[in-house]
């Protein structure tokens, strides 16, 4: 009887550990919560945007800010409070992300190509605690012309020459 209880408890412990390992493995797959807005004028061929990532931890990898900046320029678009202008998403809409999911999975993986199109302006991150979450902000320059050319050459979006 005692041997059966030990085996039963052992199986329960193994099952619980397996569940926690699986949950931990998918923690990085969670969609990012972020906001993006225009921050001013960048050099020709770039957008200057302020990205705010909303998460439970106060520490953030700089690459996550860059990823959100490129993702926001591609699929969300942004508006500027100062110039009262709106930039449409470079890729057109979120449907493009779903249609070309294989391409964007590789593009946005850790250390993926997206990193070539975003540069942090300054070294500092602004961290503000609001309730149980942190809002971590930074200004990022996104190379929109180079990003556009990359997507056209990959066949993700149609270039201007194809429309006429």
Specify the residue positions occupied by each region the protein language model found.
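Residues at the start of alpha-helices and the adjacent loop-to-helix junctions
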Residues: 14-19, 60-61
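Domain-level marker for long, solvent-exposed, non-transmembrane regions
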Residues: 26-164
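N-terminal signal peptide c-region/cleavage motif recognized by signal peptidases
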Residues: 22-23
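Bacterial N-terminal signal peptides that target proteins for export
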Residues: 2-16
């Amino acid at each position: 009887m005692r041997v059966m209880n030990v085996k039963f408890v052992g199986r329960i412990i193994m099952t619980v550990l397996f569940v926690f390992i699986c949950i931990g493995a998918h923690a990085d797959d969670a969609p990012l919560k972020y906001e993006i807005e225009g921050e001013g004028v960048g050099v020709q061929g770039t957008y200057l945007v302020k990205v705010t990532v909303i998460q439970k931890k106060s520490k953030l990898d700089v690459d996550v800010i860059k990823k959100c900046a490129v993702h926001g320029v591609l699929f969300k678009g942004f508006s500027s409070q100062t110039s009262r202008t709106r930039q449409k998403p470079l890729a057109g809409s979120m449907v493009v992300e779903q249609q070309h999911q294989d391409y964007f999975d590789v593009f946005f993986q850790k250390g993926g190509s997206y990193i070539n199109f975003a540069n942090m302006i300054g070294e500092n991150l602004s961290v503000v605690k609001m309730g149980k979450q942190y809002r971590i902000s930074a200004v990022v320059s996104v190379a929109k012309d180079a990003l556009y050319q990359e997507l056209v050459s990959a066949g993700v979006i149609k270039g201007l020459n194809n429309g006429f």
